[in-house]
Amino acid sequence: MLRAVTFDFWNTLFVDVHGRDREQRRAQLLADELAALDMTVTDAALEDALESGFAFFDRVWVNEQRTPPCEEILDAILAALGTTMPPEAHARLVERFELLVLDIPPEPVPGAPAVLDALAQRYRLAVISDTGYSPGRVLRTVLERNAMLAPFEYLYFSDEHGACKPDPRVFRHTLDELGVRAPEAAHVGDIQRTDVAGAQAAGMSAVHFIGANNHDAARSTGDLVVRHFEELPAALGGLPCAGC
């Protein structure tokens, strides 16, 4: 029978409804730090540089199967601007970027807190999340502030381990921590490449959650496709134990 369920973080547990506001604040923080160093840049240059940071992250994420930490993303942004920063200013800006998600937080997917509490009565739960600007230690705080930390027995954040989804080792490591076999577990996530294909490659069932991000819905290979979080208890209850 199904014994464990793992969850992605972004667009599965939380929706980044204020992502654009956070991006604008990030640009302002960068501009302020550069101004303090007597460097001025145009708004267009800032926007292009921040886009270069995202592009750098995506290249590393896809090609190296790791998620570069905030320090590396900032280096890519500064390189796009053709400049560098003294170590003290660099460290200060990294910290501000990392913590920005606490000042401008995402919102829980509707129904998620109550559903997680219910699922924790039946299954062992874990989070498996790739990280970007915000490291695992900060995302733990996001979970805690929304009363969503307690249901989880284990949390895997890519910045703390090096490897990221879809590497099957990420899923297997988490299941080892939970003490269950891959056929006894299902992963819930929104991205076909990382969540669905990654979990299935590790021998797990995959539940493709499209309630917050449905970009991959048409090409999903998920064992189940779920649009509303409240559907999960019944859907998981009817999911056969893969290979049991």
What does each model-identified segment do?
Residues 1-5, 15-17, 36-44, 113, ...:
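Asp-based, Mg2+/Mn2+-dependent phosphohydrolase catalytic module
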Residues 1-114:
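N-terminal helical cap/lid subdomain that shapes the substrate entry/recognition surface
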